[in-house]
Amino acid sequence: MNDIKELGTILSIWAHPDDEAYLCGGIMAMASAAQSRVVCVTATRGELGVTDPTRWPPEQLLTIREAELAECLRILGVTEHRWLGYPDGGCDSIDADAAIEQIAGIVRDVAPDTILTFPPDGQTGHPDHIAVHRWSVEAVRRTGIGTLHVFANTQEWLDDQLARWTELGAIVGEPPIAWAGPLSIDLTLTGQVLDIKYAALAAQASQTEAVRAVVGEQAYRELIRIERFAAFAPQQAPVSQAMT
């Protein structure tokens, strides 16, 4: 990819507020600045993501994270957002076919050229991430609309950064694996775009403030500056049976 406009209309599909900023905040900011249409979908409101119950009371976290995501998307320049409305931590136990059809309806409505989501392992191993990946794959297979791209880790990145992310508690399941095939998007963010991504993540303070305080601003910028995706062809056979 030589020009962000090559991605056309972008639909990004994620599990929790802050997933979008961590994994494709730079892409969305660049595309929005280039006047491309960008639509973000979030499956849950992240109401279980308690990091400091005194500062961000659990009973208020759903509302807090809604507001944080709204500010994050404003900073990124994204004006279209859809909630799927599922419970945090429960995506792998709901009716997968209903979720797939909900996403498929959004795909048909938006008619994206590019669809961004998690890799098969969910990146962090979180069950919600893995479920959203599976739903997205099947929604694209059913609709035949757009090209699906999944977040991709290179071996170089894993060697350089995985230990740090694990130490910070970001990996909740099996560690991510290296992507063996070619990359369709390979960005190293610098300058204003990295500043925007940093600000967007800082806006989600209930999730990022503690990490930023531990590692420091410069190290945090190093952790968030890479955005890599690989084209992912949906299976030709339905995959919903594996998701129930």
Where are the regions that the model predicts?
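Active-site rim/loop-helix segments in enzyme catalytic domains that contact anionic ligands
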Residues: 1-111, 137-142
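Metal-dependent de-N-acetylase/amidase catalytic core
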Residues: 2-11, 89, 93-244
